[in-house]
């Protein structure tokens, strides 16, 4: 007689083993209709799985995050059902859940086109709308293998042979004539899988190994209702409009080319943004009492072996040789900073020592993973390393947290998710050291009033870590900032200081990044602002346009004066109609459009418009300059009179 305890503490007693669906039906028909799965004693189970003993139970519906993941996974199986009907020779590989959707890797000689994807989606919807039941069967390893061997599913056979023990009992999910294998759970009926869309198809190697066959990966998105699906599709449409690669080309910010894959060619206006970011971060470094250093791009392999990076990152490092010595271009700055720390005897009085660098790093990322500014091979990190005593860790981490939030708020990012990764199973040091380290990070977060999620076991072997993930205007997550404790690298590279008792001690090292990669952060900003940078960041802050040739000298005089006042200004003296000029510079997202005619020239004024079309009227030159300079100095996100 299992006693089932529900989330509200109420209990229901059953005479025989009972499923989650049975419990839902016992509560009411509405809940039974909405039931997708159950969380039994904390573990997700199919709605049909029997509960034999007393248990706690949460009933999962499409409104729950777990329910959404389950229906997405079932949509991947639905894709398999449909593609096998349209192209029976297809061999199915893997079909996992991803953010907002799913994909399925398939082996099909026919190269799928956009029309094929549309036909596949149509067949999926036709099948789903029959609201057929999904039937689960738990079988022996041999029966599962025989099932897939009989269907010619070589990839499923490989998964069984290589990844599943022979004494295991795999679960097979039957979608009418189609059968798939999965840990589950899955929806009990396809009525839950009506709101999806296939998005794209791309190439993907089996098991991610370029030595294996290239498969076709079909991506889809799925949601619990039509409104949520349409909201997501609208968000994707807006994201496409904001694509930094498209806007970067429109605004002539940068380009990339085949001869330097993953490397950025910064054009004048893009480099202006880059330098402005550097200037801003330098102000922060000064405010928080950092030194700025510069290390070499390339160092001997011996150093990378001592640091431990050669063992872990060799495949991602660009290397070269000279005079019988092997060198690696740095993928990160930390070993170089330890070398600077090691120059000269350090005392406890010198700590904390905060060392920052705009370090130019290179990593040999796979060519298929490169994506505009978001995933590159050459990048600049706003990297810093703090050498301190263990007693100073909490205070230093707390300052890092304040610096992160100060910085992000300047750009308008207020929705920041913080995660603390704690000790992994394989780690250096004893439990006391990890207790102190984790407590220091937790206390620093609490002291700053920061809500955070703990990720047990996700820390590095050498110390716990805080990650800062910002959410943009489209609610996309971008992991940028990190604060990582390191109890290993200083010792590996011989860093010591003289403690108060004159003994040599190894400092704790705090790795700290705020923007992360400047290139990537600029990509994020382009998409966040849709190219409409706040005035302080905009490559051109004001453009002055004449109506006739009579005002040309006055325009040139104004531009010269603006530049002297620290305003990035340009002029447009072309023999074009003023409306044409205004439209063109509006499309280039210039914050202020200044028009000069005879009257403005006579009165030593300018007619001021914003790129949003707001007419600010006529202003004196001094009033405009004073207002814009104040706006720039405060790094305001808004234009005048917004």
From Swiss-Prot:
Residues 1-61 form the TGS domain. One of its GO terms (biological process) is threonyl-tRNA aminoacylation. The keyword Protein biosynthesis applies. It is an enzyme of class 6 (ligase). GO terms for molecular function: ATP binding; metal ion binding; threonine-tRNA ligase activity; tRNA binding. Keywords: Aminoacyl-tRNA synthetase, ATP-binding, Cytoplasm, Ligase, Metal-binding, Nucleotide-binding, Protein biosynthesis, RNA-binding, tRNA-binding, Zinc. It catalyses: tRNA(Thr) + L-threonine + ATP = L-threonyl-tRNA(Thr) + AMP + diphosphate + H(+). InterPro entries: aa-tRNA-synt_IIb, aa-tRNA-synth_II, aa-tRNA-synth_II/BPL/LPL, Anticodon-bd, Anticodon-bd_dom_sf, Beta-grasp_dom_sf, TGS, TGS-like. Disulfide bonds: none annotated. Belongs to the class-II aminoacyl-tRNA synthetase family. This is Threonine--tRNA ligase. It comes from Shewanella amazonensis (strain ATCC BAA-1098 / SB2B). The lineage of its organism: Bacteria, Pseudomonadati, Pseudomonadota, Gammaproteobacteria, Alteromonadales.
């Amino acid at each position: 007689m299992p006693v089932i305890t529900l989330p509200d503490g109420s209990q229901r007693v059953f005479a025989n083993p009972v499923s989650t669906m049975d419990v839902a039906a016992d509560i009411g028909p509405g809940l039974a209709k909405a039931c997708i799965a159950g969380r039994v004693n904390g573990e997700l189970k199919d709605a049909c799985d029997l509960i034999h003993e007393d248990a706690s139970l949460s009933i999962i519906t499409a409104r729950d995050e777990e329910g959404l993941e389950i229906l997405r996974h079932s949509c991947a199986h639905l894709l398999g059902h449909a593609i096998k009907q349209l192209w029976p020779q297809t061999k199915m590989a893997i079909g996992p859940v991803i953010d907002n959707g799913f994909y399925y890797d398939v082996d099909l000689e026919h190269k799928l086109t956009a029309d094929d994807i549309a036909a596949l989606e149509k067949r999926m919807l036709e099948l789903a709308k029959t609201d057929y039941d999904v039937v689960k069967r738990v079988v022996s390893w041999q029966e599962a293998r025989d099932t897939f061997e009989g269907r010619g599913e070589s990839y499923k056979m490989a998964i069984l042979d290589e990844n599943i023990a022979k004494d295991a009992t795999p679960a097979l999910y039957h979608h009418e004539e189609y059968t798939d294998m999965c840990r589950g759970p899955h929806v009990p009926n396809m009525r839950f899988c009506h709101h999806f869309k296939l998005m794209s198809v791309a190439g993907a190697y089996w098991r991610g190994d370029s030595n294996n066959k290239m498969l076709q990966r079909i991506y889809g998105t799925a949601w619990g209702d039509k409104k949520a699906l349409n909201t997501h599709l609208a968000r994707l449409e807006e994201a496409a409009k904001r694509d930094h690669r498209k806007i970067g080309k429109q605004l002539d910010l940068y380009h990339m080319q085949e001869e330097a894959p993953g490397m950025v060619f910064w054009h004048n206006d893009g480099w202006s943004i880059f330098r402005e970011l550097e200037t801003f971060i330098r102000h922060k470094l000064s405010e928080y009492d950092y030194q700025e250093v510069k290390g070499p791009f390339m160092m001997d392999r011996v150093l990378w072996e001592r640091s431990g990076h050669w063992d872990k990152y060799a495949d991602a490092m660009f290397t070269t040789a000279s005079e019988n010595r092997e060198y690696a271009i740095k993928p990160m700055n930390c070993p170089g900073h330890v070398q600077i720390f090691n120059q000269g005897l350090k005392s406890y009085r010198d700590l904390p020592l905060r060392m920052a660098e705009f370090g130019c790093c290179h990593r040999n990322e796979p060519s298929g993973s490169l994506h505009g500014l978001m995933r590159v091979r050459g990048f600049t990190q706003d990297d810093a390393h703090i050498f301190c005593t263990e007693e100073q860790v909490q205070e230093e981490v707390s300052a890092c947290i304040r610096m992160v939030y100060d910085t992000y708020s300047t750009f308008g990012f207020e929705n920041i998710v913080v995660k603390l990764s704690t000790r992994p199973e394989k780690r250096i040091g004893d439990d006391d050291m990890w207790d102190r380290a984790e407590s220091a990070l937790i206390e620093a977060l609490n002291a700053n009033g920061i809500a955070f999620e703990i990720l047990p076991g996700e820390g590095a072997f050498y110390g716990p870590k805080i990650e800062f993930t910002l959410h943009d205007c489209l609610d996309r997550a971008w992991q940028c900032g990190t604060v990582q404790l390191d109890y290993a690298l200083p010792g590996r590279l011989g860093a010591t200081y003289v403690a108060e008792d004159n003994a040599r001690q190894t400092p704790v090292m705090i790795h700290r990044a705020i923007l992360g990669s400047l290139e990537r952060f600029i990509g994020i900003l382009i998409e966040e602002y849709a190219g409409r940078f706040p005035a302080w960041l905009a490559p051109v802050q004001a453009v002055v346009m004449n109506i006739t040739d009579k005002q040309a000298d006055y325009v040139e005089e104004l531009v010269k004066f603006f530049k002297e006042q620290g305003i990035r200004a340009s002029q447009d003296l072309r023999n074009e109609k003023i409306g044409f000029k205004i439209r063109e510079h509006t499309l280039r997202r210039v914050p202020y459009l200044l028009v000069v005619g005879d009257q403005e020239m006579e009165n030593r004024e300018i007619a001021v418009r914003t790129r949003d079309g707001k007419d600010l009227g006529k202003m004196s030159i001094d009033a405009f300059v004073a207002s814009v300079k104040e706006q720039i100095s405060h790094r305001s996100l808004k234009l005048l009179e917004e």
